[in-house]
Amino acid sequence: MTLVPMVVEQTSRGERAYDIYSRLLKERIIFITGPIEDQMASLVVAQLIFLEAENPEKDISMYINSPGGVVTAGLSIYDTMQYVKPRIATLCLGQAASMGSLLLAAGEKGMRCALPNSRIMIHQPSGGFQGQATDIEIHAKEILNIKSRLNYIYVKHTGRELSEVVASMERDNFMSADSAQDFGIIDKVIEKRLDIDV
């Protein structure tokens, strides 16, 4: 069981207790922590849409510490990030691997950051399937289509040539925060909150 801290606020109506993530959501901060899977993606998508409805002009911050996860779940978050009107600042603390790195790169240009000891990892998608030969062939084609789609998303957000992205994602490619900045996944490495404008 995971322990989630509670925050108690004093208001004119008395005390009110929030779990820490709900309190941070009031400040327009969304956390992506742990593996990216369907339930977590649905929560993040709902938070993005809620914050847009609340104020479509005010920026949203997304803090990422994730080893990655299910590609389709990650792409649902990615598509929603591109769909909503508010600008989304992304910040890696800890790690942003696999789909986590794609979400990090998908933030608003100029507002994508990482803390100095963060680790970022990109790679091609992986998957496994068993069954009849025809079904295996269908799934192999699908994973190649997804690989191509992910490559183009990284090209769009990093400004790198397709050939560079393909070569860089051939195997697990771990990067420091500085290397991720050089690659174009983030715009800035920050040590203190004062270093960031979001």
Swiss-Prot record:
Keywords: Cytoplasm, Hydrolase, Protease, Serine protease. Its main location: cytoplasm. Transmembrane segments: none annotated. It is found in: Cytoplasm. Disulfide bonds: none annotated. Pfam families: CLP_protease. GO terms for cellular component: cytoplasm; endopeptidase Clp complex. Its EC number is 3.4.21.92. It comes from the Bacteria. It catalyses: Hydrolysis of proteins to small peptides in the presence of ATP and magnesium. alpha-casein is the usual test substrate. In the absence of ATP, only oligopeptides shorter than five residues are hydrolyzed (such as succinyl-Leu-Tyr-|-NHMec, and Leu-Tyr-Leu-|-Tyr-Trp, in which cleavage of the -Tyr-|-Leu- and -Tyr-|-Trp bonds also occurs). CDD domains: S14_ClpP_2. GO terms for biological process: protein quality control for misfolded or incompletely synthesized proteins. The active site is at 98 (nucleophile), 123. GO terms for molecular function: ATP-dependent peptidase activity; ATPase binding; serine-type endopeptidase activity. Cleaves peptides in various proteins in a process that requires ATP hydrolysis. Has a chymotrypsin-like activity. Plays a major role in the degradation of misfolded proteins. Belongs to the peptidase S14 family. Fourteen ClpP subunits assemble into 2 heptameric rings which stack back to back to give a disk-like structure with a central cavity, resembling the structure of eukaryotic proteasomes. This is ATP-dependent Clp protease proteolytic subunit.
